[in-house]
Amino acid sequence: MTQHSRDTPQFYLTAPSPCPYLPGRQERKVFTHLVGPKAGDLNDLLTHGGFRRSQSIAYRPACDQCRACVSVRVVANEFRPSRAQRKILGRNADVVGELRSPVPTSEQYSVFRAYLDRRHRDGGMADMTVLDYAMMVEDSHVKTRLIEYRRRKLEPGSTGRGEELLAVALTDVLNDGLSMVYSFFEPAEDRRSLGTFMILDHIARARRLGLPYVYLGYWIDGSQKMDYKGRYLPQQRLAPSGWERVGAEDDGLIEPQE
């Protein structure tokens, strides 16, 4: 890659392929490389414009005649958990999240492998090896972190470090929020609703850091797999005219945002 292409991002368009979320539809993506000293700034800019990061690639849907994928970000400081979400927080009161550098471990891969085998055995990531997982974590030129969620030790004198690994989130730190790149959890702990818990924890972390948003990726109208992303309100959804606010369930407001 030349110095020019590092400083001036080049965008590419993928060929059509079957959509993994809406049966019978085709998807295309526009993408660019996140490399060089300005990768972090570019990642911030593109995330604000609806892109997502995967390793050193930033991409967003560019499908013909379909705009079902909508970028969403939770307004962290205004968010109030629902009754069901409060129950999930209580159910996981014994879980501690540990912020770590993006270093893959065999313990993480064991949980990752179990998660894929149980929840996404027919998905595009189903065949990922331990080396593929390491690349997913390490291949980044932006500020990214791992958060490991463990059962909290309860012994007297405990340092707070947890016991067995329950879940992991790979998270980018942006100038205006946290972007959840990928998360997974131990499928044997389904009753904990760890996917929801990790989102709630990220909202709390963003609030403590003074960051206004948590980026969740794409809410997809008509996709049961992605419907859950619309439950964290208030949030903003990216429209052609810019970010629009979707209010709490009791007000139903949609307001244009700057």
From Swiss-Prot:
Keywords (A to Z) from UniProt = Acyltransferase, Cytoplasm, Transferase
The reaction(s) annotated as catalysed by this protein in its Swiss-Prot or TrEMBL entry are: N-terminal L-glutamyl-[protein] + L-leucyl-tRNA(Leu) = N-terminal L-leucyl-L-glutamyl-[protein] + tRNA(Leu) + H(+); N-terminal L-aspartyl-[protein] + L-leucyl-tRNA(Leu) = N-terminal L-leucyl-L-aspartyl-[protein] + tRNA(Leu) + H(+)
Per the UniProt entry, the Enzyme Commission number(s) are: 2.3.2.29
Q: Does the keyword ATP-binding apply?
A: no
Write down the Pfam families for this protein, in alphabetical order: ATE_C, ATE_N
Any one GO molecular function term: arginyl-tRNA--protein transferase activity
Keyword Transmembrane helix part of the UniProt annotation: no
Q: What Gene Ontology cellular-component terms does the record carry?
A: cytoplasm
What GO biological process terms does the UniProt entry carry, in alphabetical order? ubiquitin-dependent protein catabolic process via the N-end rule pathway
Give the UniProt subcellular location, in the record's own words. Cytoplasm
Family assignment from sequence similarity: Belongs to the R-transferase family. Bpt subfamily.
Its biological purpose? Functions in the N-end rule pathway of protein degradation where it conjugates Leu from its aminoacyl-tRNA to the N-termini of proteins containing an N-terminal aspartate or glutamate.
What's this protein's name? Aspartate/glutamate leucyltransferase
